[in-house]
Amino acid sequence: MHPEFAPVAFLSAASLALPLPWHWRAGNVATLSIIAWLFIMNMIYGINAVIWAGSARITAVVYCDITTKLTIGGNFALPAACLCLCIHLERVASVRAAQTTAADKRRRTIFELAMCWLLPIIFMALHYVVQGHRFDIVEDFGCRPATYYSIPAIFIVWVPPLTMAAASLVYASLAIRHFMHRRLSFAMHLQARSSALTTSRYLRLILMAIVQLVWLVVTTAYTLWFSSMTLNLRPWTTWADVHSNFGRIQTWPAIITPAVILRGACTLWWMVPASTWIFVAFFAFGNDAVEEYKRVLNVVLSGARRALPEGFLSEKKRDLKGFSLPSFVKGSVPLGDSSSSTRKDSLPDKAVLPVNRSVTMTTTTSTVVSSMPPPYSLPPPPPPQKYTSPLDSLDYSADADRISISSSVDTSGYTIEILPETPSTSSSTPPSPSSPQYPRSPSSQGSHVVDDYYYTSSPQDSLPHDIPAPPSLPPPTHMPDEAHISPSHAVPSRPPAFPPYPFARDMRPAASEPMSPRPITYPSMSPTHRDIASVFPGGRR
């Protein structure tokens, strides 16, 4: 008993439907023929395993007449289809034809149909020449074709499949040689030939053909060896002698059949499902097959949705009225409850969520309290400073003190004096007298106020109104040392960015270098430089 025969055969036949859609759209007659013949043989083996499970009774005679001939045809059709496939792949990889025309496709289709279907029919008819009786019935295996084992039978039944397998291996070798010769530009070569093949499809086809051919050679050789071991080579005498008592049906019950014959029959039976699995393994797991599976699944799901009664999904939604969230969400609102609303009083007091940080959400106040630090906020800006003179608007530093201009100051020499810092009434945070950013030195004119550039003025000529200060700027980063500042001449921290001066750079004052040829690019109030500055275009008089 072999209870596994029927399910294995039927599953093998069903697995051929996986790569079928892609090959059907490609219109490859050779691969479609392989699928068709493997499907036929698997169905025959499965039906035989069901009918003759544990028995060898004579039944379904007409069915056996048909299936035995189809089995003979399948032994020829599979190597013929592999030969057609290898011929096509070798022609695609070669450079004998630049492009494939419609006439070439039509001739190829006719040739493949003749090789895959007409030639097996011819050999099915030729098998009648070496058919000694009607058929055999083996227990658990069903009906099998009967062959008069002789020299003509070897050349009719076994030699043609071996010859086609050898020719297929030659064409497959040439195809691989062409591929290796132009493997770097093979994809462009396939595109230039207007072929539907890609490099991956080409490799899968050629590898499948080679593996199938090797397997068919092994199968045919084993069948020939098994027949020679179990049957004696008989001489071909006459037609009448060979076909005498032709309507006889030979039965082989398991109890009287030699064990070697049963083992050989079991081995030959498993070769057909193995050939099917080899073919499916090469094409059922590629990108094309996966895309086809997705498309079929979408079609099935869309059909299932259309088959559902109208309003089925809405009824399911109404059934969720009493459904609540999982247990880790506390205080949740039941779904589908029409009485719930977005008002604060209808929401739960507190909801605990499964997060990494300890977060507590209070819905009544719409605030979130977490362990994270509070967001940074900028401090409020200081109140604007007020100036008593229009010249204060030219001050570079926003933290400069108030300035007043006096008419009693010697404007010809621009005497600059440094006075102690006077607290500003307009600044909210007056600078410290000891601050290093604003160096000061004592002055004889205590009523004078010094700005950031150490120009002095008296409050007599100050304007009666105040001018708001410009936006606050950061304090200067560099100030001169105390040793370089004298009461008679003070050095500004950096030159002002006045429009008349093209650029500003950090240099020593021109007073220290009177013969310097450099243009004066900063306001020099020294009397010795007054006439010198008028000569240079960058100077200021």
Swiss-Prot record:
Residues 372-385, 467-478, 493-502 have a biased composition (Pro residues). Belongs to the G-protein coupled receptor 4 family. Receptor for the BBP1 pheromone, a prenylated mating factor. Keywords: G-protein coupled receptor, Membrane, Pheromone response, Receptor, Transducer, Transmembrane, Transmembrane helix. CDD domains: 7tmD_STE3. The gene is BBR1. One of its GO terms (molecular function) is mating-type a-factor pheromone receptor activity. Residues 364-393, 414-541 are annotated as: Disordered. The keyword Calcium does not apply. The keyword Zinc-finger does not apply. The chain crosses the membrane at residues 4-24, 34-54, 70-90, 110-130, 151-171, 206-226, 265-285. Residues 25-33, 91-109, 172-205, 286-541 are cytoplasmic. GO terms for biological process: pheromone-dependent signal transduction involved in conjugation with cellular fusion. Residues 420-429 have a biased composition (Low complexity). It comes from the Eukaryota. One of its GO terms (cellular component) is plasma membrane. Residues 1-3, 55-69, 131-150, 227-264 are extracellular. It is found in: Membrane. It comes from Schizophyllum commune. This is Pheromone B beta 1 receptor. It is a multi-pass membrane protein.
